[in-house]
C-alpha cells in the first residue's frame, strides 16, 4: 500500500495537571496549524484554534487530525474560519479526524461551517473513541458555496461519516451523503427546501430522555422566531444528536450555542466562552 502524503496533519494531546488542562506532544505540518492555547475568561479549560494556512481545501487534498485527551482533561477546539472546499475537477478532498478520550475527559469541538463550492467533492471521516465516563460535544455545519448559475446545490457531493465507540464498542455510525447528482436535495427526506444543515452530538453519562426533552424546550422558540426545523434524537447510548435545517448559517450557530450553553450550565456549571473570531 502506497504511503499517504498529507496536505496537512496535526497531533495534539491534552492532560490535566491538577489545576487546569494543558497541552503536550503538539505536532503540525504543512497546511494545518494549531495556535497557542487561550484560557478565555480565566477558564481552566484551554481553547485551541485550528487553522488551514492555505485558505481552503483544493483538488486532491488529504488532511489528518488526531486529538488525545488524558484522564480528567478538558478542551475546546474550534477553527479560525470556515472550511472552504473549492472545485475538485480531478480528485476529491479527504479529511480524517480521530479523537481519543480517556476517563472523565471532555472535549468540545465547535467548528465553523464547511462550505462546498461548485463542483466540489468532499469526504470526511470522524472516529471518536470514548470511555464510559468521558464526554464530547461536536458540531458540523454544511452550507452551499457560490455557484456561477446561482443555484443552491452545485457541489458534486459532501460525504460525512461519524463513528462513535465507547470502551471499544461501536455505538453510533452516522453516514451522511449529500449528492445533488444522485438525489433531489430540496425534496422530502433530504433538505426539504432548506439549504443549510447543522448537526451536533453530545455524549455524556447523564444524558437520558428527560435531559433531551429539556434541551428541546430550551430551543423550541427558534422554530417560532425563524424558518427552521429542529430535531433531537436519543442515540443508542447515553447521548443525543441534533439536526437543524434552515437557510442561514447564523441561525444554526444560534441554536447550537443555545444547546451548548444548556449543557455547560446544567452539567459543568459554567458559562460557554465567546470565541472572538470576528
Swiss-Prot record:
Chaperone found in the keyword field: yes
Disulphide bridges: none
Coiled coil: none
Keywords: Chaperone, Cytoplasm, Nickel insertion
Pfam assignment, any one: UreD
One Gene Ontology cellular component: cytoplasm
Any one GO molecular-function label of the UniProt entry: nickel cation binding
Signal peptide region: none
Chief location bin: cytoplasm
Cell location: Cytoplasm
Family: Belongs to the UreD family.
Subunit structure: UreD, UreF and UreG form a complex that acts as a GTP-hydrolysis-dependent molecular chaperone, activating the urease apoprotein by helping to assemble the nickel containing metallocenter of UreC. The UreE protein probably delivers the nickel.
Entry function: Required for maturation of urease via the functional incorporation of the urease nickel metallocenter.
Protein name: Urease accessory protein UreD
Gene from which this protein is expressed: ureD
Amino acid at each position: 500500500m502506497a504511503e499517504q502524503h498529507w496536505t496537512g496533519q496535526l497531533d495534539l494531546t491534552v492532560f490535566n495537571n491538577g489545576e487546569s488542562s494543558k497541552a503536550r506532544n503538539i505536532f503540525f505540518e504543512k497546511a494545518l496549524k494549531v495556535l497557542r492555547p487561550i484560557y478565555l475568561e480565566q477558564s481552566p479549560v484551554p481553547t485551541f484554534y485550528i487553522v488551514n494556512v492555505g485558505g481552503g481545501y483544493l483538488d486532491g487534498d488529504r488532511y489528518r487530525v488526531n486529538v488525545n485527551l488524558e484522564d480528567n482533561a478538558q478542551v475546546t477546539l474550534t477553527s479560525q474560519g470556515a472550511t472552504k472546499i473549492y472545485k475538485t475537477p480531478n480528485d476529491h478532498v479527504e479529511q480524517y479526524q480521530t479523537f481519543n478520550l480517556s476517563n472523565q475527559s471532555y472535549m468540545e469541538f465547535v467548528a465553523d461551517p464547511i462550505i462546498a463550492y461548485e463542483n466540489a467533492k468532499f469526504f470526511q471521516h470522524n472516529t471518536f473513541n470514548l470511555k464510559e465516563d468521558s464526554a464530547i460535544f461536536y458540531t458540523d455545519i454544511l452550507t452551499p458555496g457560490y455557484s456561477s448559475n446561482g443555484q443552491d446545490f452545485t457541489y458534486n457531493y459532501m460525504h460525512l461519516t461519524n463513528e462513535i465507540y465507547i470502551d471499544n464498542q461501536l455505538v453510533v455510525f452516522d453516514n451522511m451523503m449529500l449528492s445533488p447528482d444522485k438525489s433531489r436535495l430540496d425534496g422530502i427526506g433530504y433538505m426539504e427546501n432548506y439549504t443549510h444543515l447543522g448537526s451536533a452530538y453530545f455524549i455524556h453519562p447523564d444524558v437520558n430522555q428527560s435531559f433531551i426533552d429539556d434541551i428541546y424546550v430550551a430551543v423550541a422558540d427558534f422554530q417560532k422566531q425563524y424558518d427552521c426545523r429542529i430535531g433531537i434524537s436519543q442515540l443508542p447510548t447515553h447521548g443525543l444528536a441534533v439536526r437543524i435545517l434552515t437557510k442561514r448559517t447564523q441561525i444554526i450557530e444560534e441554536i447550537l450555542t443555545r444547546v451548548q450553553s444548556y449543557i455547560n450550565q446544567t452539567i459543568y456549571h459554567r458559562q460557554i466562552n465567546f470565541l472572538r473570531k470576528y
